[in-house]
UniProtKB/Swiss-Prot annotation:
Metal-binding found in the keyword field: yes
Provenance organism: Homo sapiens (Human)
Annotated motif HD1, positions: 558-587
Residue positions where Phosphothreonine is found in the record: 619
Disulfide cysteine pairs (residue numbers): none
Miscellaneous information on this protein: The hPRC-H complex purification reported by PubMed:12167701 probably presents a mixture of different PRC1-like complexes.
Classification lineage: Eukaryota, Metazoa, Chordata, Craniata, Vertebrata
Comp. bias (Low complexity): 10-34, 230-241, 337-358, 537-551
Keywords: Developmental protein, DNA-binding, Isopeptide bond, Metal-binding, Nucleus, Phosphoprotein, Ubl conjugation, Zinc, Zinc-finger
Lineage top rank: taxon: Eukaryota
Entry GO MF terms: chromatin binding; DNA binding; histone binding; identical protein binding; zinc ion binding
Annotated residues for binding of Zn(2+): 642, 645, 661, 665
Domain notes: HD1 motif interacts with SAM domain of PHC1.
Gene, per the UniProt record: PHC2
Biased composition (Basic and acidic residues): 473-483
Protein name: Polyhomeotic-like protein 2
Length: 858
């Protein structure tokens, strides 16, 4: 796809397309100019030429030949990759928004550093030892030298078996200074980490052909990116994402690398890398052709240079010796499917096939390298395969992918047997190129399983550019858990995946994979193609495609996409549609009490939070609308007053209808309403709608109650017991401002039945039954009526009178006087105080404490 994209930068783009069949069929992106000079043909950026808008990010998978024994290290790297993936995801999101021009400027910034590195690397391109030192530096693959440098560095790193060359080579758009070098590096490093489990990955962001010299490898880089492309297949599809260009480069790199590097024994690691690198040169024909034809086979420098030209691509290839074969095969498959979509890729396919062929001759060389880091490389290779299938398969998923799979299978074979060579032997030189389809059935299947295993690793890389965060997290862990995740697709895959992460298992995984691959390989290939195309289609294409590699077989492609989706704002849970808000829920809201608290919240914080809530959840806003009106009518947006006890408190503390401060008040009110007669009932109904009415009602009731008490007290006690109790209660409500006494003042006289609804009613009922004490109570009521309204102002005598007024507490009142308990002390009393200090029994103590609590509340 990227090859097809018009490349404004250099003729290299045209060359890439036109010279697809150029020097090495492996390099679909051969630049006409690069046919001879290979590296200088930096214009090969043509691959990226399509990428300019895509913010091409090349992941140079450094196939550091890590010891398989370092399983723990491998896991750590995977975790680190996951962690960095988060950072990378952020950077990737930012980069996606960056214009290609910005990416190019970034590339230019990095190119400056790369130029120096390249010069050094160009001289030391032949020497892989030089590469490592240079690899550490950020190499802009803008120039072939830089690409070589990266390739060498990666090759060296892989050869050195150093950890992931975390030198994320940010071959960013040379002209895009907009991206900060640190950003690019972070992004690259994160992606590198992603690949790290399989192999050291250097992330190169070759933007357009700013570094035309380096861009020549771009086709190869594109394929390298292919590994990343899976990460960002969708991105590649979109102009900004360099992924797709990357894919071609990956495919291309493997092709030339396969054929060229293998011949060079010294480059055995390089061969692993070189094969990728060679394939990369094949990809970037201009850059790689010389290497393919001359350097690729015999001269390490050539292959190195080819890598350099593909510096990004090569590094990835080098980084993944196994990947190189895998890429060669994988990319061939994808290239075959994508020949129509991308000339580079189709050629890559052929070249990559040759790579295996060429690699076969130097099996020992390749094997050492591959075996040394076979697991990492294998994993990385698989990723590249998976990536390319995903991203490139997107272009021509079904038909081409199957051919690509054969290549992948060979790659898998190579890796499994102990080198890409083995795989290649399975595929004849002509067979791979012409017979991708032939090889597809067997090797593709294995390859595919590898791919699935690899895909997990690659997926992390690809997700970073697009919605990689979730995907990557899953993928990165997947690398470990990939076997399980992938296992869903096929047990063989799972075994392969496990083996690959382990690194040592790789040899066995090859064995496992071949048969499963044969069984499921073809199906996987189609599934992969199908899934890959969806991945490209979807915004989450990167993660989708990477998943596609593994999930295609499972048919998990869509679910993984859903999982990958970073911003899932709507959920359906048990039939309820739940929408997430872009911001955290307000502190005041409790999401558990849907009805009550939402109403409370609507009234309490609606004025402040309503706009936010409307945006937050449709459900909330819908539920709150009715209560909004209610709260407006009440006119108490922040604070509400309980209609029963008159307590003023924050609206969110009020229950349900916002009219009562507690469930007790609501129950008492409801019971009272059923028994109440006209005056209060109509008054209450009005109070529901007007907050001011509440205060008025309270005042009116208080004003009207004292006369009642005086009148009732004048009446004979025996004749009007209920009236007396009512009067007492009303006086309590006035003086104590106790909501419970207030409630009973309204309800008790009219409805003795309601006594059971509350503690105060029970006490009232007890009082009604205690007719013998009625006279005393009446006297107490007379004295009590004159108590100060605020309990804190009571003196000892006031407290004494208050306690005497309580049922059954006449004798205890003396104890209060003896203890000199005034109003303040009374409010501080607890049951244990009463029981321990005054030797009061539990029953009376609880009653007294309940009355004291009512005083406090009032």
């Amino acid at each position: 796809m990227e090859n097809e994209l018009p490349v404004p930068h250099t003729s290299s783009s045209a060359c890439a397309t036109s010279s697809t069949s150029g020097a090495s069929s492996s390099s679909g992106c051969n630049n006409s100019s690069s046919g001879g000079s290979g590296r200088p043909t930096g214009p090969q950026i043509s691959v990226y030429s399509g990428i300019p808008d895509r913010q091409t990010v090349q992941v140079i998978q450094q196939a550091l030949h890590r010891q398989p024994s370092t399983a723990a290290q491998y896991l750590q790297q995977m975790y680190a990759a996951q962690q960095q993936h988060l950072m990378l995801q952020t950077a990737a999101l930012q980069q996606q928004h960056l214009s290609s021009a910005q990416l190019q400027s970034l590339a230019a910034v990095q190119q400056a550093s790369l130029v120096s590195n390249r010069q050094g690397s160009t001289s030391g391109s032949n020497v892989s030892a030089q590469a490592p030192a240079q690899s550490s530096s950020i190499n802009l693959a803008a120039s072939p030298a830089a690409a070589q440098l990266l390739n060498r560095a990666q090759s060296v790193n892989s050869a050195a078996a150093s950890g992931i060359a975390q030198q994320a080579v940010l071959l960013g758009n040379t002209s895009s200074p907009a991206l900060t070098a640190s950003q690019a590096q972070m992004y690259l490093r994160a992606q590198m980490l992603i690949f790290t489990p399989t192999a050291t990955v250097a992330t190169v962001q070759p933007e357009l052909g700013t570094g035309s010299p380096a861009r020549p490898p771009t086709p190869a880089q594109v394929q390298n990116l292919t590994l990343r492309t899976q990460q960002t297949p969708a991105a590649a599809a979109s102009g900004p994402t360099p992924t797709q260009p990357v894919l071609p480069s990956l495919a291309l790199k493997p092709t030339p690398g396969g054929s060229q590097p293998l011949p060079t024994p010294a480059q055995s690691r390089n061969t692993a890398q070189a094969s990728p690198a060679g394939a990369k040169p094949g990809i970037a024909d201009s850059v790689m052709e010389p290497h393919k034809k001359g350097d690729g086979n015999s001269s390490v420098p050539g292959s190195m240079e080819g890598r350099a030209g593909l510096s990004r691509t090569v590094p990835a290839v080098a980084a993944h010796p196994l990947i190189a074969p895998a890429y060669a095969q994988l990319q061939p498959h994808q290239l075959l499917p994508q020949p129509s979509s991308k000339h580079l890729q189709p050629q890559f396919v052929i070249q990559q096939q040759p790579q295996p062929q060429q690699q076969q001759p130097p099996p020992q060389q390749s094997r050492p390298v591959l075996q040394a880091e076979p697991h990492p490389q294998l994993a990385s290779v698989s990723p590249s395969v998976a990536l390319q299938p995903s991203s490139e398969a997107h272009a021509m998923p079904l038909g081409p992918v199957t051919p690509a799979l054969p290549l992948q299978c060979p790659t898998a074979n190579l890796h499994k047997p102990g080198g890409s060579q083995q795989c290649h032997p399975p595929t004849p030189d002509t067979g791979p190129q012409n017979g991708h389809p032939e090889g597809v059935p067997h090797t593709p299947q294995r390859r595919f399983q590898h791919t699935s295993a690899v895909i997990l690793q690659l997926q992390p890389a690809s997700p970073p550019q697009q919605c990689v965060p979730d995907d990557w997290k899953e993928v990165a862990p997947g690398e470990k858990s990939v076997p399980e995740t992938r296992s869903g697709p096929s047990p063989h895959q799972q075994a392969i995946v496990t083996a690959m992460p382990g690194g040592l298992p790789v040899p066995t995984s090859p064995n496992i994979q071949p048969s499963p691959a044969h069984e499921t390989g073809q199906g996987i290939v189609h599934a992969l193609t199908d899934l890959s195309s969806p991945g490209m289609t979807s915004g989450n294409g990167n993660s989708a495609s990477s998943i596609a590699g593994t999930a295609p077989q499972n048919g998990e492609n869509k679910p993984p996409q859903a999982i990958v989706k970073p911003q899932i704002l709507t959920h359906v849970i048990e039939g309820f549609v739940i929408q997430e808000g872009a911001e955290p829920f307000p502190v005041g809201r409790s999401s558990l009490l849907v009805g009550n608290l939402k109403k409370k919240y609507a009234q309490g914080f609606l004025p402040e939070k309503l706009p936010q809530q409307d945006h937050t959840t449709t459900t909330d806003s819908e539920m709150e609308e009715p209560y909004l009106q209610e709260s407006k009518e009440e006119g108490a947006p922040l604070k509400l007053k309980c209609e029963l006890c008159g307590r003023v408190d924050f609206a969110y503390k009020f229950k349900r209808s916002k009219r009562f401060c507690s469930m007790a008040c609501a129950k008492r009110y409801n019971v009272g309403c059923t028994k109440r007669v006209g005056l209060f009932h109509s008054d209450r109904s009005k109070l529901q709608k007007a907050g001011a009415a509440t205060h008025n009602r309270r005042r009116a009731s208080k004003a009207s109650l004292p006369p009642l008490t005086k009148d009732t007290k004048k009446q004979p006690t025996g004749t009007v017991p209920l009236s007396v109790t009512a009067a007492l209660q009303l006086t309590h409500s006035q003086e104590d401002s106790s909501r419970c006494s207030d409630n009973s003042s309204y309800e008790e006289p009219l409805s003795p039945i309601s006594a059971s609804s509350s503690t105060s009613r029970r006490r009232q009922g007890q009082r009604d039954l205690e007719l013998p004490d009625m006279h005393m109570r009446d006297l107490v009521g007379m004295g009590h009526h004159f108590l100060p309204s605020e309990p804190t102002k009571w003196n000892v005598e006031d407290v004494y009178e208050f306690i005497r007024s309580l049922p059954g507490c006449q004798e205890i009142a003396e104890e209060f006087r003896a203890q000199e308990i005034d109003g303040q002390a009374l409010l501080l009393l607890k049951e244990d105080h009463l029981m321990s200090a005054m030797n009061i029994k539990l029953g009376p103590a609880l009653k007294i404490y309940a009355r004291i609590s009512m005083l406090k509340d009032s």
